[in-house]
A protein has these predicted regions:
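Intracellular coupling helices
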Residues: 4-17, 21, 280-321, 383-394, ...
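C-terminal transmembrane helical bundles of large multi-pass transporters
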Residues: 627-711, 715, 728-729
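Hydrophobic alpha-helical transmembrane segments of multi-pass inner-membrane transport and secretion
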Residues: 10-39, 259-295, 322-323, 402-427, ...
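Generic structural signal for small/hydrophobic residues in well-ordered secondary structure
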Residues: 8, 18, 28, 32, ...
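Mid-to-C-terminal secondary-structure elements
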Residues: 107-119, 132-258, 461, 465-644
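Membrane-proximal extracellular/periplasmic loop immediately following the first transmembrane helix
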Residues: 32-91, 95-97, 104-107, 198-210, ...
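Small-residue-rich transmembrane alpha-helices
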Residues: 27, 31, 227, 240, ...
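Membrane-helix entry/capping segments
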Residues: 6, 10-11, 46, 224-271, ...
Length: 778
């Protein structure tokens, strides 16, 4: 080991490049490994995961309150049925303390479906009248005086009977209070109980079945029960079932924590690509430097060492080097984890644990990486015969195309990532600049819990008095943002209904948005609605202008009294992420002021000053009503609200950009190291060529040509891969850019600039060497 350390100290540049590259790559491998393990751990948190199913309609796992009644006690295969819902942004009063948190309303059977650990109390205590469990996090916030006081949420006064332990990675979202449906007194819950099958809400229904129940047969029996219950109702169509261990990555809406399978695959690929790039640097440099250790290994062979001894020595050195790199990589990963979590915004945050199972896994990673890193250099040096080293012929034999192949592979990775990042940036700007087809300039959208209080009138009047407010209207949604959707039956087809977004606003907001009226059928009233040109064609099967109708079936077998008052020009109601074959929209824009709707404010002057003024008024009235500041659901200018929809994609793009930068740096370091090695190896050759008439310029061109050929080869391989990958990326967007050739022209140009810039200085320095001084060294 002493000779190895001495060798590293004599080759500081190569050592630094290998160590930095491998440490950074291993940091991302560690992050990716923890991300993958912790995501999949969520799917396995319940030991009965293969016996529990979420049920819903058309892959939408939310139901009406009465869905539990449909299944409970009806089938011998079903052991338990539970229903529950999460209600966010609830004002919680405990004594003199106020909190804003999430309420979980459920039944006792909830404990059969989810792994919930109680620090205090027992599951059966939830059946007690007005009982509540609180989270460990909330319990820590309560002072001694509040701990014995009742807990008040809306119309419910509860007494605390237990504490739920804080969980790590889990399918359940964080919640602060758990209470029983049977004892809830709020208006919404009472309306569910009074009309259990009329209110479709964000309620999950889970069933637990006996072991070895056939899934298909169970689904048929559950569907039959639903057909009987909803035979005269249009609200229930095809039943869907998702097993517990499938929920986390399911495409269906569940109301629970969600995993991103696409990002999971991306993180795996990212970790592997960076590891491959760093390993190529390590292997390439060690193979190139084998000649510098040839005499040492020849001497060992001459004094009795076997080939296997040499191989094990190299593998041992690789293990030590990888172990130190891993320790540094672990520190880098620990430091980077908050940044990566912020970029990913995953429901299950990444952590870097140091428990025994993880330490064993880390050790296995070190062993595998060290084997991959050390086996090739070990095999090459072990094949060398001592006599070849003594004669000086070994260094000529070890020059193969391997180093060039590694450089090409490294640059292929970097080039593909550069093209992908350019495409992602262009697509992001394309979405942000997408016109909605309506006026959204200087419009501010404010939606909060004040919308449902008696304080709203005073709040609105104070807003009207602000100098920055020109006009104020009510609107339940805005264009360019996904909104409430209704089922709409096509008049010319027998197929299932189409789900159509609704924009509901008053006449003032209708004018603010600047809808273009194509045709008015008659007088408007609060119960009539506008329909877009595309919706006319889609619903009737005839182009706009070839039909005449005044009613639309909102539900199969049911005709509502609302009438079509006219046709408006098409506009963008959905965001750019959702792929749809049809772009239907209904607009209720004829009603008067709706006190339960959100606020649409037209402002004048500086946007930042206007936002500060509006926020100050909101905070004042919010604290007056609730005693605490409650974050509004919407609180920004309409164009900013639209742009915020793409925050997730923007953050993921920043992560890919970070990976791209690391990959390019690794590639650059590899080129610098190899150009330095090749320059020192070719110093004598260049000197001889200059003696026989070569010039500095000719030697620069000759040596640079070799790197240009390598980068050109990398581009030939990388560009088709990049084109395919970029096309796949863009397929996820309904509103997307064309994949222009200039993107790849810029990518190729950048790859050449990076490559030439990283090797040119070494080529120039060796080409300027005095031939006399170079030949003296020989």
């Amino acid at each position: 080991m002493k000779t190895y350390l001495k060798f590293l100290s004599r080759n500081k540049l190569y050592t630094a490049i290998e160590f930095v590259g491998l440490s950074v790559a291993l940091a991302f491998v560690i992050i990716s490994f923890c991300y993958v393990v912790q995501q999949y751990a969520v799917t396995r948190e319940n030991p009965d995961r293969e016996r529990i199913y979420a049920v819903g309609e058309n892959k939408n796992m939310i139901n009406c309150y009465g869905m539990k009644e449909v299944f409970d006690g009806k089938l011998p295969e079903v052991e338990a049925v539970s229903h529950f819902q999460f209600v966010q942004d609830q004002l919680i009063h405990v004594g003199e303390q106020n909190f804003v948190g999430t309420l979980l309303v459920c039944d006792v059977e909830f404990f059969d479906m989810f792994s919930v650990t109680l620090k205090e109390g027992a599951p059966g205590m939830l059946s007690e009248c007005n009982a509540a469990f609180i989270s460990e996090k909330l319990a820590k916030k309560l002072n001694e005086a509040s701990a014995e006081q009742p807990l008040i949420i809306q119309d419910d006064t509860l007494h605390i009977v237990g504490v739920i332990a804080d969980k790590g990675s889990s399918l359940l979202p964080d919640f602060d209070v758990m209470m029983n449906y049977e004892h809830a007194q709020s208006y919404a819950i009472q309306s569910y109980r009074d009309n259990p099958f009329n209110h479709w809400a964000n309620i999950g229904t889970f069933i637990k079945v006996r072991p070895d129940v056939d899934r298909e047969e169970l689904g048929e029996k559950l569907q039959a029960l639903c057909d009987v219950q909803f035979s005269n109702s249009p609200t229930m169509e095809e039943l869907s079932m998702v097993r517990f261990d499938e929920l986390f990555f399911a495409s269906a809406y569940t109301g629970l924590q969600k995993g991103d399978r696409s990002m999971l695959r991306t993180m795996i690929v990212i970790g592997l690509l960076l590891l491959v790039s760093a390993l190529l640097n390590y292997i390439n440099l060690n193979v190139a430097l084998v000649g510098k250790r040839a005499k040492e290994m020849a001497s060992r062979r001459l004094v009795g060492a076997q080939k296997s001894d040499i191989v094990w020595k190299f593998l041992g050195e690789a293990f030590v080097f990888t172990l130190f790199s891993f320790v540094v990589g672990l520190a880098i990963a620990y430091a980077l984890t908050p940044t990566v979590n912020q970029l990913l915004q995953s429901d299950v945050a990444i952590s870097i644990p140091f428990s025994l199972p993880y330490l064993v896994a880390y050790l296995l990673i070190v062993i595998v990486v060290s084997l991959l890193a050390g086996i090739l250099p070990a095999a090459i040096i072990a094949k060398a015969q001592p006599i070849d080293v003594v004669r000086g012929t070994f260094r000529f034999r070890n020059r193969t195309v391997l180093s060039k192949v590694f450089i090409v592979v490294q640059n292929v990775i970097a080039i593909v990532l550069i093209a992908l990042v350019l495409t992602m940036e262009l697509q992001m700007h394309h979405m942000e600049d997408r016109p909605t087809g309506l006026n959204v300039e200087n419009l501010y959208f404010l939606g909060s819990d004040l919308d449902y209080t008696d304080e709203k009138e005073a709040f609105v009047e104070e807003l009207r008095a602000l100098p920055c407010v020109k006009e104020l209207a009510s609107a339940q949604s805005i264009p360019g943002v996904m909104s409430m959707r209704f089922g709409l039956k096509k008049l010319h087809e027998t197929e299932p209904k189409t789900y159509v977004p609704i924009l509901n606003c008053d006449t003032v907001a209708f004018r603010m948005f600047g809808f273009e009226v194509k045709e008015r059928f008659g007088d408007t009233d609060a119960h009539s609605f506008w329909i877009t040109e595309t919706t006319v064609a889609g619903m009737t099967g005839l182009p706009y202008g070839d039909n005449n109708f005044d009613t639309i079936k909102m539900w199969e077998n049911h005709t509502i009294g609302n009438t079509v008052c006219g046709v408006i020009a098409d506009f963008k109601m959905q965001d750019a992420l959702h792929v749809t074959d049809e772009d239907y929209v209904l607009v209720y824009g004829n009603g008067g002021w709706n006190p339960d709707s959100h606020l649409l404010i037209e402002v004048a002057g500086d946007h930042r000053e206007a936002k500060r003024a509006i926020d100050a008024v909101y905070k004042k009235h919010c604290e007056k009503v609730f005693g605490i500041y409650m974050e509004p659901e919407f609180d920004d200018f309409v164009d900013n609200v639209i742009a915020k929809q793409y925050d997730k994609h923007r953050r993921q793009m920043r992560l890919i950009e970070l990976i791209m930068a690391v990959s390019v740096i690794l590639s650059l370091l590899g080129l610098v190291a190899m150009s330095t090695h090749f320059a020192s190896e070719r110093e004598k050759t260049i000197a001889i060529r200059k003696v026989f008439g070569g010039t500095m310029q000719s030697e620069i061109r000759r040596n640079l040509k070799e790197y240009i050929i390598m980068i050109l080869s990398a581009n030939v391989i990388a560009i088709p891969v990049a084109v395919w990958l970029c096309k796949r990326y863009l397929e996820d967007f309904a509103y997307r850019i064309d994949l222009h050739p200039w993107i790849f022209v810029v990518t190729v140009a950048l790859s050449f600039v990076i490559a030439i810039g990283s090797v040119l200085w070494q080529i120039v320095s060796v080409a300027r060497v005095n031939p006399v001084m170079a030949l003296k060294k020989e």
